[in-house]
Amino acid sequence: MIIKPKVRGFICTNAHPKGCAANVQAQIEYTQAQGKIENGPKNVLVVGASTGYGLASRIVAAFGCGAKTLGLFFEKPGTERKTGTAGFYNVAAFQQAAEKAGLWSKNMNGDAFSHEAKSKAIDVIKAEMGKIDLVVYSLASPRRQDPDSGEVYSSVLKPVGQAYTSKNLNTDTLKITETTLDAASDEEIAQTIKVMGGEDWELWMNALAEADVLAEGCKTVAYTYLGEKITWPIYGKATIGKAKEDLDRAATAIASAHSEKNISANVAVLKAVVTQASSAIPIMPLYLSALFKVMKANGTQEGCIEQLNRLFTECLYSDSPRLDDANRFRVDEKELSPEVQAGVEALWGEITEENLLEISDFKGYQQEFLGLFGFGVDGVDYEEDVDPNVALALVE
């Protein structure tokens, strides 16, 4: 079929297999161009491996370090009449490239929050991998089913304490309006922590430790975004911020529970990028449009793959990692530089519907958003008839 983007609000409901493959290939080539990472991991588990920072982590582990990788994700394959999800096509492209490069790689599609996923992953690790020396936890999910009680928790994106009003860009109509987000209830905060906090990260590490599949000195990392003044009320001082604070708690708990194996657990603070998760957050499309304009102008703009290569070389596998006082790796330092933030704040005050395309980089934002789903990628023929049903071998 000929596949053109179908966008509804902040979601694109289809994906292009060849565009997704080209994106993955570009990230692989960027990583290879950086050269081999010294003292990198050998056996890596990536929980949430199909898009964004999780996918980039897996690419750096495999193509930057030569590691075996086991990737978990929750994606839909294509059929003859319907496209699969972008994440499915990303993993299929990664798998093909890994095989071509002679890298061991296996994939699991399912609910990473379940006990079943954990035991299945452990079986694969025991049978085929050797002990794990890096666990990447990179899940972005709106819901989580408690594996014991069966209760389903849902996350919300709301400020904490008081309502928050800010300008917001409707990415369909290009209208800029004031949007008010009501404050979250205690119950909504608790549910968001259950979904997006550190509990499942702990459960993964406990299950892996109990099965004795973690190497001595294994590292584990989970990702967060903190942001600055503009995004703080909807990120840092909001339900999502409360959940991310719980990641800090979990990191400390993991390191202390498994100290006999010298396990290190850190949260890594990464920069704002366009992902399927961030495009759903009010304020972020407009903030990102301003941020890209400023960072591109001063030559510091980075996407997921640039960020992850730096996380590995400057933090995870560095003798002098960049840590803050909460023991978090920081790779957001370019975004948070006073110069960049001042530039973004100035633009934020000036942006209107009339000058949006002129003074911000909304076009760049849009291009990145469509690119997530494999559209608008250089070198891809979008008039070509393509098969949406792409093969990918999965762990049964």
From Swiss-Prot:
Signal peptide: none annotated. It holds the Pfam family Enoyl_reductase. It is an enzyme of class 1 (oxidoreductase). The record marks 75 as: Plays an important role in discriminating NADH against NADPH. It catalyses: a 2,3-saturated acyl-[ACP] + NAD(+) = a (2E)-enoyl-[ACP] + NADH + H(+). Its EC number is 1.3.1.9. Keywords: Fatty acid biosynthesis, Fatty acid metabolism, Lipid biosynthesis, Lipid metabolism, NAD, Oxidoreductase. The active site is at 235 (proton donor). NAD(+) binds at residues 48-53, 74-75, 111-112, 139-140, 244, 273-275. InterPro entries: Eno_Rdtase_FAD-bd_dom, Enoyl-CoA_Rdtase_cat_dom, FabV-like_NADH_b, Trans-2-enoyl-CoA_reductase. One of its GO terms (molecular function) is trans-2-enoyl-CoA reductase (NADH) activity. NCBIfam families: EnoyACPredFabV (NF043048), PRK13656.1 (NF010177). Monomer. Involved in the final reduction of the elongation cycle of fatty acid synthesis (FAS II). Catalyzes the reduction of a carbon-carbon double bond in an enoyl moiety that is covalently linked to an acyl carrier protein (ACP). HAMAP family: FabV_reductase. This is Enoyl-[acyl-carrier-protein] reductase [NADH]. It comes from Teredinibacter turnerae (strain ATCC 39867 / T7901). The lineage of its organism: Bacteria, Pseudomonadati, Pseudomonadota, Gammaproteobacteria, Cellvibrionales. The gene is fabV.
